Amino acid sequence: MVNIHVVIPARLKSTRLPGKMLADIAGKPMIQRVYEQVAKSKFKSIIIATDSQEIKEVAENFGAKVILTRDDHESGTDRIAEAVTKLGFADEDIVVNVQGDEPLIPVENIEQAAQLLIEKPEAVVSTLCERITEAEDIYNPNNVKVVFDKNNYALYFSRASIPFERGFSENHQVSISEFFRHIGIYTYRVGFLKHYAELAISPIEKYEALEQLRVLYNGYKIAIEQSAKPTPAGVDTLQDLEKVRKLFDV
């Protein structure tokens, strides 16, 4: 039987919003909000992987299982790879990476991402996306765009506006029907996750600062489909944090 685990990578020294994992959201730190959201699911286990003693203490105080990792990881995926190795998960097990800055992610989407990987044996990773509905989101580098093939395998992820609409000009109203925003949730097979950590950082991964590009660069498949439910964007900026706080205060 394949066990499905959730690991939440949590780094205190975020580049764009330092300390955001412990930012207060209606009386609770953000990492607790994320953990409680994930806990509504029925997966085998939920673990927080962090390089911060402060986050570890906070998380243990609200009852989470925590594992300390190195502080020099290039990405959350690398951090999770260390965690699953320490935890001794079997290669055939599945791990869902739920970002520690997505307190509003629907449980249905987490379960959907895990099921997608089970249904796509050719893929080593699965993830989700949703159609972009506002033109301004196409040009926001914090909204990662994705293009995928007819079989629902990702072709490329970018902070740029992909696909490019040929003939576009400032006076042209861009069609947004074919633009998709990547939702920052990943599901991996544990055996591949361990291998991922051994792969060199790819040039495109470094250029775009997108960890999933290491998978594509090395010739592996990422399965992707539109999410069952809308997913609010994660907390990357102070403005994002204020928006989330207002939603919890309602």
Swiss-Prot record:
Keywords: Cytoplasm, Lipopolysaccharide biosynthesis, Nucleotidyltransferase, Transferase
Subcellular location: Cytoplasm
Similarity annotation: Belongs to the KdsB family.
Catalytic activity, EC: 2.7.7.38
GO molecular function, one term: 3-deoxy-manno-octulosonate cytidylyltransferase activity
InterPro entries reported for this sequence: Cytidylyl_trans, KdsB, Nucleotide-diphossugar_trans
Purpose: Activates KDO (a required 8-carbon sugar) for incorporation into bacterial lipopolysaccharide in Gram-negative bacteria.
Name the UniProt record assigns to this protein: 3-deoxy-manno-octulosonate cytidylyltransferase
Gene Ontology CC annotations of this record: cytosol
BP GO terms, sorted: CMP-keto-3-deoxy-D-manno-octulosonic acid biosynthetic process; lipopolysaccharide biosynthetic process
